[in-house]
Each structure stands twice: as structure tokens, then as C-alpha cells.
Amino acid sequence: MKKRGKKPELDWETEEQEEIIWVSKSEIKRDAEELKKLGAKLVDLTKTNLDKIPLDGNLLEAVELARRSVKEAKRRQLQYIGKLLRNTDVEPIRDALDKIENKHNQQQAMLHKLELMRDELVSKGDEGLVALLIDYPQMDRRHLRNLIRSAQKEKEQNKPPKAYREIYQYLKDFIIEE
């Protein structure tokens, strides 16, 4: 039989000095759901993009298994990935994922900018070409001028926009290489 002793007295002063952070159950659930969504994003990545993200062995294995799973098994695997993410530092993972997503957004913005440049070249003609050559003096003026005139003729005659596409391709090749 064990002897029962007195309960240790609490030192209220030291307890008040320690900062206790209470986290509600709802907040814990929100954080867990957020980590599960992060895990789902990892599962949806391509193999090359997944290799760019710093994942430990267990997490990488769980993500690859979730890719092969279907329906209910995939849901359970996503739960497991969320659990693994709770025990790891997710900031490097989020940073790498943001870089991958932003790279895609930047590429889309660049392609949209090229489309606008092409539209401006075709609508303004030589004025647009002069403005473009100020920014990119290495471009072939004669070739671009011929493409612009061909695109304008195609537009007037309701022909397929072959030169219109060629302008875009020329801009894309030249500007993206630079």
C-alpha cells in the first residue's frame, strides 16, 4: 500500500508569470483542416514539382501512396498526411509550394502581356512597332513590319489569322529568351 502524502502546494506567483496560451478546440480543428488542404495540394502536384519541395521520407511516401489511392482510401491517406504535417515544420513546404504556384501565375501574366503587345502592334501598326522597338531594339524591324501588315490584311479579308499567330510566336520566342 502506498502512502498518501500531502498535495504539493502550488506556487501561484510563478504560475502567473508563465504565459499560458489557450487554444480553442475549433482553432485546432481549423489548423488541422488547413494542413489537410496543404496535403491535398501536395498530392495534386506533378512528380517534378513534388521533388522541389522539402519533404521527409515518411511524408513523401504518404503523398505517393495517396496519389495511387482512390475514394475512401485517398481520404484516409489525406487525413494521415495532415497528421504528419502537424508534426513537421510546414513553412519551408509552404514557401516551396508558393514558389511553384507563383511561377505558373508569372508565366500566365507574361503570356497575357505578349497577347496585349501583339494586339497593340496589329491595331496601331508602325506606331506600335516604334514603341516596341524602343523597349526591344534588337528585334528584327523588317520581319515584324511584314508580319504586322500581313496580319492587318488577313483581318480585313477575314482570312485565318496565320500572321497574327506568327507575331505572337515571334514575340514569345524573343522576349522569353531575353
Swiss-Prot record:
GO terms for molecular function: ribosome binding; rRNA binding. It holds the Pfam family DarP. InterPro entries: DarP, DarP_sf. Disulfide bonds: none annotated. Its main location: cytoplasm. One of its GO terms (cellular component) is cytosol. The keyword rRNA-binding applies. HAMAP family: DarP. It comes from the Bacteria. Keywords: Cytoplasm, Ribosome biogenesis, RNA-binding, rRNA-binding. It is found in: Cytoplasm. This is Dual-action ribosomal maturation protein DarP. NCBIfam families: PRK05255.1-1. GO terms for biological process: assembly of large subunit precursor of preribosome. Member of a network of 50S ribosomal subunit biogenesis factors which assembles along the 30S-50S interface, preventing incorrect 23S rRNA structures from forming. Promotes peptidyl transferase center (PTC) maturation. Belongs to the DarP family.
